Amino acid sequence: YDTRTLKPLHPQYVSSVDSGNLAGCLLTLQAGLAELKDQPVLPANAFQGLLDTLQVLVEQLPPSSTADLAKKLKLLQDALTPNDPPRTLADADRLLNEIQRIGGGLVTWLPAEIDIDGELYYWAQAFDQQFRALRDDLGYLAPELEQFSTIPTLAELATKGSAYKDAVARLRTIDDLAGRCHELAVMDFKFLYDTSSGLLSIGYDVSERRRDPACYDLLASEARLASFLLIAQDQLPQKHWFALGRLLTSHGGDVSLISWSGSMFEYLMPQLIMPSYHHTLLDETCKAAVSRQIEYGRQRGVPWGISESCYNATDMNQVYQYRAFGVPGMGLKRGLGEDLVIAPYASALALMMMPLEACRNLQTLAAYGFLGAYGFYEAVDYTPSRVLRGKRHAIVRAFMAHHQGMSLLALEHLLLNQPMQRRFLSDPLIRA
């Protein structure tokens, strides 16, 4: 789609894998919305989130900062690190009032000459906005605090009479959004299924009104989320799963499935919401794929992590070009060794399989200067033909929303005990 007009770009095309990913994410979002009803209106980690933002702000503090500002930040840190989080709404309200008293409007305490585009101003503004949102939401949902001996759920608030009409309205909004997710997730994929091969076509060309003759024929593919979901919904027969190719490769004693391009995306993207079962072929494949990526990076003397991404070439509009890259020996595609493009989001995906190794690699990427204001840069191109003479690499200074989003999902998979997998599996058809 044209991002300015939202009109479909030509050729108009219905992608099987993108549609499957969308349907799976909509069902996961629907389950996440349903959870909001029975969660405390003040999440247990709300004040920890404020403290995290404050600590990032403190890290940006220059040595020349005023003593008053440093003292204020220290008082805020002390207030946000109690022995126990607030146990009642009244306790939470008192803590919010204390934060307001100590440091309400942190931005106003910054030096007059501060760079408003700098990190210090950004994080001070983020803290102020985060604090106001928390305080305003609590006041909106629970105007009468003292009658609760614990922190109630949204559903409990909605039963407490007319004073809590906004909680009732919030529940209606949640139900409306969940219903829309369900409706949008109901997609008919049957016209994309090739009955003769038992495989899913890669898509449908709307302009030519024909199904694409090419099919997704490998289990180690980003399309397996669509396959899994459609079998669960009885849109495709179970035999489709077993029609997916299971060509094997081995390296260093590890056996794994072969993908088309040997990219981290093909192996790990579906795991962002799909369940993983230890000691299965897919689980062992994903681990082996990460191990091989680590080894290949070591062999080439670069940080590891190769996937589909932008690279250091632009079109006439100075837009970075994009395609799949991978590790030789892991993919069927020819010429995988001709390019060397490292995508930081590939390391983020690997957090789900090998968290320690992935974390170390992300730290290395940051130390090399590949971390920008909005996260890690899209890619680092080490391909000699695309690097200036005398330089070893070229940074692709772009940020792609879907790669940043995948990175966030991989982080929450690791840090929050796989909530997306739990939500995805809460759908009765998928659970069955």
Task: Describe each PLM feature range.
Residues Y1-A432:
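Ser/Thr/Asn(+Pro)-rich, low-complexity disordered segments
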